[in-house]
Amino acid sequence: MLIDCGDESIRTTLNKLDITKIVTVLFTHHHRDNVAGITDVADAGTEIGVPESERQYFENVEDFWSDPKHRWHLYNYRPHNLMLAKSVKVAKTYKNGNHMFFGNAKITVKETPGHTDASVSYLIEVDGNRVIFSGDLIYDEGQIWDLYSLQKGDWGTDYHGFLGDRKRLATSLDLLKGESPSLLVPTHGNIISDPFLAIDTLMKRIDLCYDRYLAISALRHYAPDFFPYYADKDDHMPIRSGKKIPSFLRHFGTTWIVISENRQAFVMDCGSTQVIREIEKLQELGEISEITELWVTHYHDDHVDAIPEFQNRFSCYTRTDSIVAQVIESPEAYRIPCISPAVVNVNHRTDDGESWEWNEFKMTAFHFPGQTYYHGGLLVEGQDLKLFFSGDSFTMAGIDDYCSGNRNWLGNNTGFDRCLRLVDELKPSHIFNCHVNCAFDFTDQQIEFMLTNLSEREVLYRKLFPWDHPNYGMDEHWVSCYPYEQRVSSGEQVELKVKFTNHSNAPRIATCQPSLPKLWQTIVTSRSIEIQPNTTDEICFFIDIPKDIQKNKRIVIPVDMSYNGRPLGQFREAIFVT
């Protein structure tokens, strides 16, 4: 019997142990890096058992991969795209309290959601021992494998649910403690000989991490009533009052408009056709004449969905940060939160710190990796004012980092640390958020408070994850396939890149190998690369598409990988569309 089976390396282990037959495989949850090895060890007689509520994520994965809601406008994390590429047949399903026997071992199923909505643990009682196979609830004493799997919304979508499943995780871990296990055996992680200490340490760390997150969270502005138990805490930053906006600005939806003295308009973002209607009304009223420029703050769908129609309606020059442009010009190449299929025509990709004149205003663009890594900031100087348009990165309550998939990095001059230092240097008279009607600003003391908070988090999260830098546990997309999705034709050769971000302070070796469908009868040789510290590099593969490939199919190409000797399994995937 096996419990979980993450990758093909299990076959080597079985051979060393002279095990030739696998009778049963029990799975704690459906994630591919926990399951994909099953195709290398199972035969027709192997009985596969899974959590009852996750059966569809084993037996019917094709529905997941073909459903557009799991590809575009991604606001939910459950189920996660760490899904098998191809369905497997399930023999049995299990729910809380089910018992089974294997030899003289009694196995009891415990429903332990947290890492996924329906993950289970298995209590093994044999020879007087009580051992729990706990899936990915815990990695080691005080540690978890990653943070982003706990993204879960208490209200609305999962997008706003940073560490949102920490309560269910705590309940599940308390349940395990109540079973008085002698050992915990995680799927990713080390065998834990003191479960009580390991669990208590983990939950104390998670609670402290959440408190530090909330202390400067922009979400407190949008939903102040949701956090009453954190009100008036001395170590939480007070929420600042708003400021009146200058008379030459207009705000509709997520769009800010600057109107010059000659009545020309400079528009930022267009997430809804209603914005186009509002601009047409301003033209009818004579408040503005023509739209001459469009600035795109970031790639999220509520900021770009209507840009193609906007560009058809108004003949204007479109600018955006060069890193933002990578996404909005080729959205099919990415699978990241709030991604829109809308393709934006960008006339000019701005460099960090690049300036230009627009009527009486001086515009200066910055790469501004705040709410998301793919984000720009714009300083507008004129009429004796310094206005900073921060996209969605700030509110008067603090920073917008409540979706772990947005790539909010920790570190000096990185992520929000970089953004806050830039604002401190520029000292704008007004700061603007695309979702907030009024302006605001930060005091020097508030900026220092937020910078200190981020430094504290870096130390806290380093303890929480089994990595040498916390960004590996926080940045879900530190490894990605590029393009994520591409159209392929029979008989052609296509390129697939696997990109790795080395968050460490020393070089790291990355190794990977795409896993092609067995019917293709093609094996791609694994490749490795040394990645320099604090850089992103890529491994390129050229893949031959079979001449007899079926048309109108979405083919999932998982990529097996390791990082500096640590096996990650089929950690990422790409999509080929025929």
Map each language-model feature to its residues:
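Metallo-beta-lactamase
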Residues: 2, 99-102, 106-197, 201, ...
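Active-site HxH/HxHxD metal-binding segment of metal-dependent hydrolases
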Residues: 7-101, 274-277, 282-356
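Accessory terminal helices/loops
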Residues: 147-256, 262, 417-511, 523, ...
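Short, acidic/polar linear motifs in exposed loop/turn regions
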Residues: 272, 502-507, 547-549, 565
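Short, solvent-exposed loop/linker segments at beta-strand-coil boundaries, enriched for Pro/Gly
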Residues: 516-522
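Short proline/glycine- and polar residue-rich coil/turn motifs
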Residues: 529-537
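Short, surface-exposed loop/turn segments at beta-strand-coil junctions that are enriched for proline
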Residues: 530, 544-551
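Terminal connector regions
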Residues: 548-578
